[in-house]
Amino acid sequence: MKPIWDKGKPVNELIQKYTVGRDREMDLMLAKYDVQGSLAHITMLQSIGLLEKDELTALSAGLKDLLPVIERGEFVIEDGVEDVHSQVELMLTRQLGDMGKKIHSGRSRNDQVLVDLKLFTRDRLRGIVNSVKSLFDILIKQSDRYKDVLLPGYTHLQIAMPSSFGLWFGAYAEALTDDMLLLRAAFDQANRNPLGSAAGYGSSFPLNRQMTTDLLGLESMNYNVVYAQMTRGKMERNVAYALASVAATISRLAFDACMYNSQNFGFIKLPDDCTTGSSIMPHKKNPDVFELTRAKCNRIQAIPQEITLMTNNLPSGYFRDMQLVKEVFLPAFQELEEVITMTAYMLDHIKVREDILSDPKYDAIFSVEEVNRLAREGMPFREAYRKVGAEIENGTFKADHNIHHTHEGSIGNLCNDRIAARMESLTAAFPFSSIDAAISRLTSK
């Protein structure tokens, strides 16, 4: 098939292969959203007189027929076809003749791929939000379950003060609430309509941009047509930062889990079927899941920088550099969802040791408790600090394992209910139901 930009001159196959690259492979992920965007666009075209009602009916039916094909994984971009936009138009043209070519009126592939990317991102962020919430629920459950089980707290990898599994699980739960804030900001950037910006400078057709915004359930539009094109790359980068924030939280948790599972710490134990073995050492039970999770999370954290390097030296307007952003951006959602799902599974099956601080080597961890006790009894804090320090040095310190932390967020007052309420408020604010209603109206037969 000739490219849709064909002007009647021979196509250099070497150039064609190089410029298309992996675009057909990547664009398969966008097929459903290309159909949704096209349905909104042709509905708007009919409203301004660029399509007849019978043409809209035929084109809509043809587009809607593609959706189950896409859902079944049977949609393909044929050899010689550049991208998903060209494939959809080709299929309509085969079915409807020249009428199929009318769907491109008032539109460029620039704003077409932009809306595809935004609809894709909006949808996949929803999956991430739901997965993060599921992981959060398990962390809160485990925090409540093990709230009274003490754990050494570390600074500089030196034993520091008493902590608890309640604090440890709860810390990562609250971390996810801040990550959710970034996911919401990313979602809001994706939930704006670039359709009508065409190649980046608008159209002489009297396009109704508000109509396509409403039909797609988008919150608003990218008003300035030049800026609409400038969101290409920027939107992906900022969304990638939100994904990276989630990945950073999980990566840190994975490191803790690997360390706590080692024999030198022995704070947690993984079920045998959640570990792997060695080909030479029969005693090994390796935490490979958490190690791979850590590596995958670090790879995800590199994506914003990779996108930045592709886009940070470009002036306004569209450039083909943007095509390569899809290769690192589109697959990131599935990888992060798999990471979150596996992390939730592992944490739900983890076993904790309940007598860790009974080991005398951790006695010094209670030194601050003793300093504070002496200070409460009237001894100046610095004098109490020196007294307890001297006792530790000469081996006369007697640890009192009874701790009394009552302030908000401490061992004795985790505030998990408040943390859970914050997460509930954040997730409830996503407008998923209104989006579902809009897309259902648009795509129903």
Feature locations, PLM:
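Short amphipathic alpha-helical segments with heptad-repeat character
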Residues: 118, 122-129, 133, 140, ...
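Acidic, glycine-rich loop-and-beta core segments that form the ion-binding/anion-interacting portion
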Residues: 216-304
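A helix-coil-helix interface module used to build multimeric assemblies
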Residues: 1-202, 207-213, 220, 276-277, ...
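Charged/polar positions within long, soluble alpha-helices
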Residues: 43, 47, 68-75, 93, ...
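Alpha-helix capping and helix-loop boundary segments enriched in small/acidic/polar residues
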Residues: 104, 109-112, 156-163, 167, ...
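Glycine-rich cofactor/substrate-binding loops
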Residues: 1-37, 98-99, 266, 281-445
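A short structural micro-motif
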Residues: 61-69, 230-233, 390-395
